[in-house]
């Protein structure tokens, strides 16, 4: 994703970390985060919050989250990395793109498990709310504070404050012309659209067709990626502020109906919210190109398909073949549709090679993790996965503070390495604290609230059969919540 892609070249580079540079996400650093990644990442955002023990069948996901988060940090920490190492890495791979792609595969794999096991749309959205928003609001607040004291800057994608506030309400700033604050939250826009699609597909009982959706979005990235407009609505229709307001109202109303009503109205509400999200993703992206956005959805549904294969709902031969095909489509979309701009032929070749390696290695990493899912992992690695959402959202602010306090560009190689190691230690300590005192307590609040809502209004579960063993799904659900 060019977003994860940092930069106008749509790839993130060391400079992507600069607040004023339009680079990729992280840009999730590469316009690509999370987790929640899932975690994001969220599971849905880059990090997951349910601890899966080091020997648990879900521990491998925590290990992958931690690895993905560190790749994103490396991408934004580029100006602190010894130039010799940094330059060689970017000749072959964009760490930000790679990390975010891994996060999106994880989100696709783990998030549907929670929704399908419990069968409750209301519980799913309450879980998402308390899983993602508390730390998200903290990260936005910290970024604003640093901007006010002239330590951090804004990227400038969204020049209108009201539009930025409205777009941040639904974590959809990257498809509503809002400011991505902090810069890595661009990836949460695509996580949110994925959740909306999952909800609508689940309520329509067509959610098991994951392979078809993965192939469809992958093919759309190749066929339509160079045709669909970028930021069409905000540039050609009403003002960005009005579009963001209308989108917020329609999506929130649709979700309220889907969560609070019964029968056909709730299905219509879910479908309406999903249609708005998908339309914005395809036509109104302000940082990623349409081919990048569609490739992201293809990767997430590929993760879902692999989850179904692991649960016996697809044959492994079929799942692997389709996964390879989707990765090939995502690679083809990037090579075919990216805009070379002022790049020389050699620079264009390096970009294409980096894009290929980022997508390919993300898929390979996920495949290796899935293959060794029953291995017992070191506790430190699984802990990095648990705090990965904090690492993803908070590392840009810590980098700004670190850069303000110290500069290492002229130090010797080993002194610079020691300073970098100190930064990582501080980052892990801070993110461990936010996980223990912000993320985990608020997740508990969400679980208690969901139970109270069930007691007050009755369960809203859909009778959707799941073939996977109950114990396995229980683990998956806890990891996604």
Predicted regions and their residues:
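Interfacial loop-to-helix transition and helix-capping segments at the boundaries
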Residues: 58-59, 88-100, 178-190, 229-250, ...
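Alpha-helical transmembrane segments of multi-pass integral membrane proteins
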Residues: 97, 292-308, 320-440
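Transmembrane alpha-helical segments and their boundary/interface "anchor" motifs
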Residues: 97-101, 114-152, 159, 164-167, ...
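Membrane-interface helix-loop-helix regions
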Residues: 132, 136-196, 208-209, 216-235, ...
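Functionally critical transmembrane alpha-helices in membrane proteins and complexes, commonly lining
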Residues: 59-115, 133-136, 140, 364-365, ...
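Solvent-exposed interhelical
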Residues: 192-238, 250-271, 307-320
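Aromatic-anchored segments of alpha-helical transmembrane domains
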Residues: 70-77, 217-231, 273-286, 325-339
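Membrane-proximal cytoplasmic C-terminal regulatory module of class A 7TM GPCRs
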Residues: 404, 413, 440-481
């Amino acid at each position: 994703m060019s977003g994860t892609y940092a930069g106008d070249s749509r790839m993130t580079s060391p400079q992507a970390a600069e607040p004023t540079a339009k680079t990729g996400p992280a840009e999730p650093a590469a316009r690509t985060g999370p987790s929640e990644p899932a975690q994001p990442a969220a599971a849905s955002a880059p990090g997951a919050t349910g601890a899966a023990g080091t020997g648990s069948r879900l521990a491998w996901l925590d290990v992958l989250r931690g690895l993905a988060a560190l790749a994103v940090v490396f991408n934004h920490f580029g100006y602190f990395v010894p130039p010799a190492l940094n330059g060689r890495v970017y000749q072959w791979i964009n760490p930000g793109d790679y990390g975010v792609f891994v996060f999106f595969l994880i989100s696709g794999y783990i998030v549907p498990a929670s929704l399908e096991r419990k069968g409750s749309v209301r519980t799913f959205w309450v879980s998402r709310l308390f899983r993602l928003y508390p730390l998200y609001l903290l990260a936005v607040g910290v970024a604003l504070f640093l901007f006010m004291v002239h330590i951090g800057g804004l990227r400038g994608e969204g020049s209108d404050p009201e539009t930025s506030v409205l777009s941040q309400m639904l974590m959809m700033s990257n498809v509503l012309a809002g400011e991505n604050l902090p810069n890595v939250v661009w990836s949460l826009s695509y996580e949110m659209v994925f959740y909306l699609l999952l909800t609508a597909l689940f309520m329509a009982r067509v959610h098991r067709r994951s392979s078809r959706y993965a192939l469809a979005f992958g093919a759309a990235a190749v066929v339509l990626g160079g045709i669909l407009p970028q930021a069409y609505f905000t540039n050609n229709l009403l003002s960005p502020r009005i579009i963001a307001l209308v989108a917020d109202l329609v999506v929130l109303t649709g979700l309220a109906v889907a969560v609070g009503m019964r029968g056909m109205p709730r299905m219509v509400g879910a479908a309406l919210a999903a249609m708005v999200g998908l339309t914005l993703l395809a036509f109104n992206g302000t940082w990623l190109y349409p081919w990048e956005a569609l490739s992201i959805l293809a990767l997430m549904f590929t993760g879902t398909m692999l989850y179904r294969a692991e649960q016996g709902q697809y044959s492994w031969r079929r799942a692997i073949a389709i996964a390879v095909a989707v990765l090939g489509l995502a690679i083809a979309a990037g090579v075919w549709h990216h805009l070379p701009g002022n790049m020389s032929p050699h620079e264009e070749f390096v970009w294409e090679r980096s894009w290929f390696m980022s997508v390919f290695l993300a898929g390979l990493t996920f495949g290796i993790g899935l293959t060794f899912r029953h291995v017992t992992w070191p506790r430190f690695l699984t802990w990095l996965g648990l705090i990965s959402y904090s690492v993803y959202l908070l590392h840009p602010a810590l980098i700004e503070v670190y850069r303000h306090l110290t500069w290492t560009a002229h130090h010797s190689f080993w002194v610079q390495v020691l300073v970098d190691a100190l930064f990582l230690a501080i980052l892990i300590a801070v993110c461990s604290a936010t996980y223990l005192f912000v993320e985990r307590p608020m997740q508990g609040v969400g679980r208690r609230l969901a139970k109270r809502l069930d007691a007050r209004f009755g369960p809203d579960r859909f009778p959707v059969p799941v073939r996977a063993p109950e114990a396995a799904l229980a683990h998956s659900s806890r990891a996604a919540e």
